[in-house]
């Protein structure tokens, strides 16, 4: 769309990425929209679960995380809301009266989304529901709490999710809208290699506990000569003890904007998707794939199938089928600098050519233009 638009985003949080990977992509996407000349405002609950836990759990690290966000994204206009207040509907009407496009992320309280949608007919904005989670597949009843019949369309972060909205929820207009890397923040850095293998990821409510055992913990036990580091949150005591037993260094919460430095200090990174993304939702890469490749680090993945041909498996990254193969690949890559270099270059090339937040911002504008016809 050639005209300059007023765009509103409602998300669980943009400020906090604590156990909240959605913030990664949304930050970069909103900045690219601003750079296209649009006016963007981001709304989030003042007491969001992610921000509350960030402040409660992380101490000084929380201050560092928020400060780094503010420095990295000065363009973003953040408005904190209190959706339980009686005057919230009036607040919404005043805020959205000149808005052209409203993006409603899936990890919002349904009552927030529904109150926004109740104003759509009166105010005339385009409303798009953005889903970058597996709930539509695993807990469909939770999605039905949203008044989806009022949206102009759904942005689904994978074709499998898009089909669920079309076939399962009866949404006529749905687009596959993958996440992508914010290449201004995620790019190769020059650092001395101090880590052999890094895994950046949260525990995931037992959605990949067996996979972490097979593809992270067991290889680390088999290769004690490697220095293996884990970043993430919500690891239960049993999991932490397993890391200790495998001589894996657990470092806890890592503000996402610090990830490029950790990748630069590491020889190889792992991608171990949650079970849903290697089974029923095969083909959907999570944000860590885009970010790791954008940082130019060789990536080795536990099983997942790139059904949408986003990448070049075997060239952009490696996929192993079991823990034994993971162990073999880690041993091989540790010794073969040429193989590491080629993997890193290939993955970085694919990201830059196809999977940046600028690519997705352009796609979003094309979708909005299609709706407006």
Model-found features: residue ranges?
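Alpha-helix capping/helix-boundary segments
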Residues: 108-109, 160-162, 235, 299, ...
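Conserved beta-strand positions in the Rossmann-like core of class I SAM-dependent methyltransferases
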Residues: 41, 229, 300
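Carbohydrate-associated surface elements
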Residues: 160, 177-180
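A short, Lys/Arg-enriched amphipathic alpha-helix followed by its capping loop at the start of a domain
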Residues: 28-38, 218-223
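Conserved catalytic-core segment of nucleotide-activated headgroup transferases in glycan assembly
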Residues: 182-265
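Catalytic binding pocket for nucleotide-activated donors in carbohydrate/polymer assembly enzymes
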Residues: 25-28, 44-45, 241-246, 251-252, ...
């Amino acid at each position: 769309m050639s005209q300059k638009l007023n765009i509103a985003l409602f998300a669980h949080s943009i400020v906090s990425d604590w156990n909240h990977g959605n913030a990664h992509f949304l930050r970069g996407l909103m900045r690219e929209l601003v750079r296209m000349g649009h006016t963007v405002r981001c709304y989030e609950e003042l007491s969001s679960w992610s921000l509350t836990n960030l402040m409660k759990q992380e101490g000084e690290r929380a201050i560092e995380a928020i400060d780094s966000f503010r420095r990295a994204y000065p363009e973003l206009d953040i408005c904190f809301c209190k959706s339980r207040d009686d005057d919230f509907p009036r607040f919404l009407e005043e805020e959205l009266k000149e808005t052209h496009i409203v993006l409603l992320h899936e990890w919002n309280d349904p009552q927030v989304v529904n109150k926004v949608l109740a104003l759509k007919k009166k105010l005339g904005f385009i409303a798009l529901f953005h889903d970058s989670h597996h709930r539509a597949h695993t807990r469909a009843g939770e999605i039905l709490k949203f008044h989806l019949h009022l949206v102009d369309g759904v942005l689904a972060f994978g074709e499998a999710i898009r089909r669920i909205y079309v076939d399962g929820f009866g949404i006529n207009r749905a687009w596959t809208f993958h996440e992508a890397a914010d290449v201004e923040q995620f790019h190769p850095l020059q650092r001395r290699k101090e880590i052999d293998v890094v895994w950046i990821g949260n525990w995931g409510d037992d959605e990949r506990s067996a996979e972490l055992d097979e593809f992270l913990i067991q290889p680390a036990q088999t290769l004690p000569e490697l220095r293996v580091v884990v970043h993430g949150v919500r690891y239960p005591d049993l999991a932490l003890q397993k890391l200790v037993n495998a001589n894996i260094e657990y470092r806890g919460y890592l503000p996402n904007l610090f990830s490029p430095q950790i990748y630069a200090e590491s020889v190889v990174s792992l991608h171990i998707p949650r079970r849903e993304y290697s089974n029923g939702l095969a083909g959907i890469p999570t944000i860590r794939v885009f970010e790791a490749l954008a940082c130019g680090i060789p990536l080795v993945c536990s099983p997942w199938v790139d059904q949408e041909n986003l990448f070049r498996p075997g060239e952009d990254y490696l996929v192993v089928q079991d823990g034994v193969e993971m162990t073999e690949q880690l041993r091989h890559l540790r010794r073969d600098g040429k193989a590491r270099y080629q993997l890193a270059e290939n993955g970085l090339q694919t990201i830059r050519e196809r999977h940046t937040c600028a690519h997705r911002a352009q796609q979003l504008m094309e979708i909005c233009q299609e709706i407006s016809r």
